[in-house]
Amino acid sequence: RYGVSVKVYDNGLSLNTKILTGVNKLADAVSATLGPKGKNVVIHPKGRNPVITKDGVTVANFIELSDPFENLGVQVIKQASQQTAAQAGDGTTTSIVLARAMLREAQKYISAGVSPVELKRGMDKAAEDIVSHITDIAVPISSEQEIEDIATISANNDRSIGKLIATAVDKAGKDG
């Protein structure tokens, strides 16, 4: 009567499986772009020219699935990656890949009867421990040479790009 299609799932596992299927479709497309050896992805939106990109966010933004429950998984993971972009300025592709891994593993525990609330508490505790460990082992950098070395690695070992980035960071200051 309202023009809304409703599909009833007899159990949460069926619904979770559909959502995870959508997450997998998104993560498979996006993960191909990850890292220095990431691959280009060709996107051909209906009625528009194709786009070739190695940017995971661009790939993610074009993905919309016809199945509403699979698309729900896509939209939730896109939201998580957008929050990563807003907070960190980068890392969106990595956040999509990590979110998929977390959901896959969580599904195993939920299927075995673990409470989703307890699972979330465990994930939160693990995240705190990871952040604490990273903070403990982090090595502060300050010199232009250290910045150049790191930037060079990030630029596929192109020393000239590393030097340019180090100079720019030095001029902008540590807080930009």
Residue ranges and their predicted role:
Residues 1-176:
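N-terminal glycine-/lysine-enriched basic segments
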